[in-house]
């Protein structure tokens, strides 16, 4: 039924590819889109941005917003990868004397490597809670007994498939107080039902098209809480990413 959408990958291989988690086959439309982007640049050069900013970006934002039930498509920042977006968010705190971060021991490699490096900087104090059967209880307890600047966790953990339920997310948000919360949806987006409408003004939600969304590489996003005032050192402001 779906093979016709994946003809390029299927023609290029002579084996069955099972990829519940790893590199998926991409549908033919992703190749067509890549070639269309190249051809558009060739025919318009500097003028290419007019179509990209006025048509392509808004259409992409609206589609993402629909998939995650986010009411403000215009407040979805786009970037080639989630590391870019997350690092910009973290950079909002670089001017503080100390930055307290609460996360887990099961984040995906890009964040895990980055936070490990930042821990070498005396400015960053990072606590990582083990993801086990008592995770939610332990994570909420940490939040209730400490004050953090940043809270980062996955909605679905890549190494176990454990899912943070909406009820558990409610508990985390309530216990986090004024902390900046970033929910990594890279392994939930387009894989399980995602509805962030209840928290859209309380969290940053980031994900991308590479895996389950079947959009190929280079299209990632982050939702911004309403009236976000954070100012990354790597740009003039998070809001500028969506204008």
Predicted regions mapped to residue ranges:
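Pyridoxal 5′-phosphate
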Residues: 1-243
């Amino acid at each position: 039924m779906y093979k016709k959408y994946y003809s390029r990958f299927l023609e290029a291989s002579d084996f069955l590819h099972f990829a519940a988690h790893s590199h998926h086959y991409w549908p033919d439309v992703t190749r067509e889109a890549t070639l269309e982007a190249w051809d558009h640049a060739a025919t318009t050069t500097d003028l290419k941005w007019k179509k990209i900013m006025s048509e392509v970006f808004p259409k992409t934002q609206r589609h993402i917003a629909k998939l995650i039930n986010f009411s403000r498509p215009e407040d979805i920042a786009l970037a080639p990868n989630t590391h870019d977006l997350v690092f910009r968010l973290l950079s909002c705190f670089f001017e503080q004397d100390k930055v307290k971060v609460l996360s887990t021991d099961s984040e995906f490699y890009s964040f895990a490597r980055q936070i490990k490096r930042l821990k070498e900087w005396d400015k960053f104090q990072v606590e990582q809670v083990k993801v086990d059967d008592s995770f939610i209880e332990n994570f909420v307890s940490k939040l209730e007994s400490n004050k953090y600047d940043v809270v980062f966790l996955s909605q679905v953990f890549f190494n176990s498939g454990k899912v943070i339920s909406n009820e558990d997310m409610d508990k985390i948000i309530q216990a986090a107080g004024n902390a900046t919360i970033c929910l990594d949806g890279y392994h939930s987006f387009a894989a399980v039902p995602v509805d962030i409408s209840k928290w859209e003004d309380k969290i940053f939600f980031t994900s991308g098209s590479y895996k389950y969304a079947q959009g190929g590489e280079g299209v990632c996003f982050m939702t911004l809480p309403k009236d976000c005032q954070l100012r990354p050192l790597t740009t003039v402001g998070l809001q500028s990413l969506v204008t």
